[in-house]
């Protein structure tokens, strides 16, 4: 600037316009006011009613061009397109002219006097003081000041369009009009610079708001000014101020306002604050990782993202110009809410502008703004309040809050997708809960996520639900109807259970807010139908919190376990895969194994399965038989399923029909409905069409479950028998997916027929649970010995081989055999029911113990799922078809799903045992298989934050990997079956990051709702068997929804209670824990979040 001035000085005085002394320039030009001011003011008044006028900087090249024209032509044509397109270059040039004056318009010598004048607290006195100081101004300066002030007042009248109120204009103009030589010499450092800014802003704003009082009604000529000044000292100083006092403009400064007044917030330059804020916003918002490198940018994008309307307006105005400042933000808040942003923005924009004077002007404006704001605040004037600083502060706050929110809820997905491995990315993106901010966002925004809310009703969207958003849940829904009937056949149930668990995991990630533990009780007490669904979905599961009615959705999604999983499993994510494995198991076990946990801990992996099963049994309610059924389930399954009640033939028939039914998903749904309708009808429907046969058996089981909710023992007997057969079948199926599975299917069909007959007979006989339990126990004990030996022999062989091979292989074998049944499993809805029951823990315990408990041991032994949890067994064997269904539906994930079941056996067990991975800590003993699950699910150890996250978030995290990295563990396994579509959905939803959390949830909800119809019977399944809270008076209604698993739950409990031959290692005591079902429910309510979430993970992940 100095160099420019020097260069100009070299030329003739006539040629110099900028940087020339004002008085000298006016003398040479013969004008009362500088031509630059007059031309620019006229142009701005005509064309400059735009946002951010005088605050935004024009294009530097245009400013320089216009500057040269003024110096050469004296009066250039400002109406050329170049200037009309860049109006701000004209306003910037006008400010630059005053900024470059050797002596400021208000002169250096009067700076102290102005500062003293504004220091007066009372407005009348201040007005007098200011008038006295203005009288000391040279006449050219006074005329020019009056012309400029009237122009600015006129422009302030358009503040609605320009967002430039009197305060904003004062802030941007003050540094150009009033400066302190001493402060400039000091380099604008220290408190003196801030004081200068205050004085500048306060003085200029005061003059702007009192133009009429200070300059009279009309402009005064030079002589008039002189005479007027001399004549007015008394009148104006005394009378005029007092008279005009009532007339202060809206921006009148409070009488108390002083140079030092105002909050320190005003002190910093608005420009500085705003710029810093923009930069921080850019990086903090985490719009992109490179945002860190965008600090140099104007920050328009960042501000645009900010919720502030002013910033948005700034962006718009800024778009037209190159200046980074946003014209939309006014420099001052209050009357000039936009003014404050202007102060902030204006200075920042000038600085970026190439025009040095402009940037200086902005800086001084910034300083002035700072002063004005403190002064205004001190005065407390409504208009003069530091609206500008407030606006800036508010903008900063908004930016900070928005950044935090966006980082947590919006932008997390991008970073994860970019930097993290696929499995971690998917996990992170699904619940953006890995980040602490994300956890906050999910606690706030996450609650909004439909997935969290819908998760309670997995029936509607097992896969597409919150976590299983992908399409597979839909498939699972379809499979679920058939699977429910197939629940009797272990293999099919097993896959669906895994799918359910996965969906539950996903939902848990969403519903971590709604503690599964607490919501699970809600499910129980919500409604019979809803509760039944809730139980089926996850008695221990907590969909009830969100919406009892969502139980069906939760069931399909296997939400219950997922939610629990998340609360307890956050450590899972934090832990390494191995660590997470252990964490999952305890989580699954802790909730469900309130009573049986010790057992589970004592037991081996298989025993853990049984223990988990036992835990589920308590959840299931007074179904100790389930434990016994679990224990003696294998023998009973073989013996009882085949011989007990002499329904083995029927059971086989049911199995065959079930297989056929698997082949025909449509039939499954129909049969499912039939099963819901009545046991006989369901059985007949299932038998009538062998395609639906399996579904018929399951449906009969469902009916039995309904009845079993009343006659749980009877239903459990039948179911346990059916499950025993299913176990035998599943064990065979596991070892020999082809032939043995078929035999098992036949056996199970016969068993189902027997169960149906038994169920009918028992229902007719009075539905005596004890009688049924005794009968089942007797039959189961008999068959426990017979079939247990057979099944266990096979199972142990299978378990050994499969465990060695890995639960995945066992599940794969089952999946192969189950694949043939996959239609069955899909038809059963057993996947949804089983997994949901597992998730619910109680429902699963009943359903799985009946149908799956039997399989449980086989699966645990043969598949090594016993290590994971009983409920996994239940899910696998209790709902082998469901599991198979899950495995079959997404055959590729089948091994994974099998493995999750095997390891945490989340399918069979919602109970922590099944999850042995990283549950509350109960099932840690359950182990290797579970560990495999977790490993298979890279448990996203990425951030310890996960541990802090609610279980829902963890489960969410785990679910995500299912899509990107199908794993045998619960993360991937469960969704695999049921979430072929759901996985895609989930992965896109989580990993894509493109889908907002809410959008993903909404998608999951839609899918869940679509699938809800098919899944409801699964919901009822858990209801009937699992919860004492759920009215068992309506077992039929419950069974209809959860037919496959309810049978397993009911029959299995009977068997478990009566005969724990195989379950002996699980020990019948778990059956006793079943008796304190309400207690376990309470426990689960508290831990359900963790426990069920873990099983869901084990299965799904």
Curated annotation (Swiss-Prot):
GTPase-activating protein (GAP) for RAC1 and RHOA, but not for CDC42. Its main location: cytoplasm. GO terms for cellular component: cytoplasmic vesicle; cytosol; intracellular membrane-bounded organelle. Residues 224-243, 300-400, 451-529, 621-906, 965-991, 1050-1101 are annotated as: Disordered. It is found in: Cytoplasmic vesicle. The record marks 55 as: Arginine finger. Residues 308-318, 658-694, 701-735, 759-770, 779-822 have a biased composition (Basic and acidic residues). The keyword Phosphoprotein applies. This is Rho GTPase-activating protein 30. The modification Phosphoserine is found at residues 576, 996. It comes from Homo sapiens.
